[in-house]
Swiss-Prot record:
<keyword id="KW-0833">Ubl conjugation pathway</keyword>
<comment type="function">
    <text>Catalyzes the covalent attachment of ubiquitin to other proteins. Has a role in the formation of chromatin structures that influence the localization of transcriptional silencing factors.</text>
</comment>
<dbReference type="GO" id="GO:0005524">
    <property type="term" value="F:ATP binding"/>
</dbReference>
<comment type="pathway">
    <text>Protein modification; protein ubiquitination.</text>
</comment>
<keyword id="KW-0547">Nucleotide-binding</keyword>
<dbReference type="InterPro" id="IPR050113">
    <property type="entry name" value="Ub_conjugating_enzyme"/>
</dbReference>
<dbReference type="GO" id="GO:0043161">
    <property type="term" value="P:proteasome-mediated ubiquitin-dependent protein catabolic process"/>
</dbReference>
<dbReference type="InterPro" id="IPR016135">
    <property type="entry name" value="UBQ-conjugating_enzyme/RWD"/>
</dbReference>
<comment type="similarity">
    <text>Belongs to the ubiquitin-conjugating enzyme family.</text>
</comment>
<dbReference type="GO" id="GO:0000209">
    <property type="term" value="P:protein polyubiquitination"/>
</dbReference>
<keyword id="KW-0067">ATP-binding</keyword>
<dbReference type="GO" id="GO:0005634">
    <property type="term" value="C:nucleus"/>
</dbReference>
<feature type="active site" description="Glycyl thioester intermediate">
    <location>
        <position position="90"/>
    </location>
</feature>
<dbReference type="Pfam" id="PF00179">
    <property type="entry name" value="UQ_con"/>
</dbReference>
<keyword id="KW-0808">Transferase</keyword>
<protein>
    <recommendedName>
        <fullName>Ubiquitin-conjugating enzyme E2 15</fullName>
        <ecNumber>2.3.2.23</ecNumber>
    </recommendedName>
</protein>
<feature type="domain" description="UBC core">
    <location>
        <begin position="5"/>
        <end position="165"/>
    </location>
</feature>
Length: 167
């Protein structure tokens, strides 16, 4: 059975990332039988609250990739304004293409077929460095980030330590 264009593209992109891995993350397949499910390890970026942490996540690609974006979900507990309590990452680049019906994002900030898994992961590392508390996915984390930054830092550092212990 021939591979779909989506499968061929994902195989090529996975091979490229594994051959020349950018600093801060590594990727592989959840199961060798499906190119549509990737496991990701993100290393908390230097000079951030998440520094030194090891955060596991999955990237789930739709059959119509790259026309539509994948979904990303942390499987390691993380406390961040732009990560839903269930681990789903909420950043513009992962939102479907087109206009935002709520008017928070420009169409150019959302998913475009020219994006790649690498651009997504770089955006997630940037998100860890600079949380956006203006349109949060986790309202409690955003509120604590704004109103009680010391407690926010303590909670994040505790989860970073836990992520290291889980390795």
């Amino acid at each position: 059975m021939p591979s779909s264009a989506s499968e061929q593209l994902l195989r090529k992109q996975l091979k490229e990332i594994q051959k020349n891995p950018p600093q801060g993350f590594s990727v592989g397949l959840v199961d060798d039988k499906s190119i549509f499910e990737w496991e990701v390890m993100i290393i908390g970026p230097e000079d951030t609250l998440y520094e030194g942490g090891f955060f596991h996540a999955t990237l789930s690609f739709p059959q119509d990739y790259p026309l539509m974006p994948p979904k990303m979900k942390f499987t390691t507990e993380i406390w961040h304004p732009n990560v839903h309590p269930n681990g789903e990452v909420c950043i513009s680049i992962l939102h479907p293409p087109g206009d935002d019906k709520y008017g928070y994002e420009d169409a150019g900030e959302r998913w475009l077929p020219v994006h790649s898994p690498e651009t997504i992961l770089i955006s997630v590392i940037s998100m860890l460095s600079s949380p956006n508390d203006e349109s949060p996915a986790n309202i409690d984390a955003a509120k604590e980030f704004r109103e009680n930054p010391q407690e926010f830092k303590k909670r994040v550092r505790r989860l970073v330590r836990r992520s290291i212990e889980m390795i």
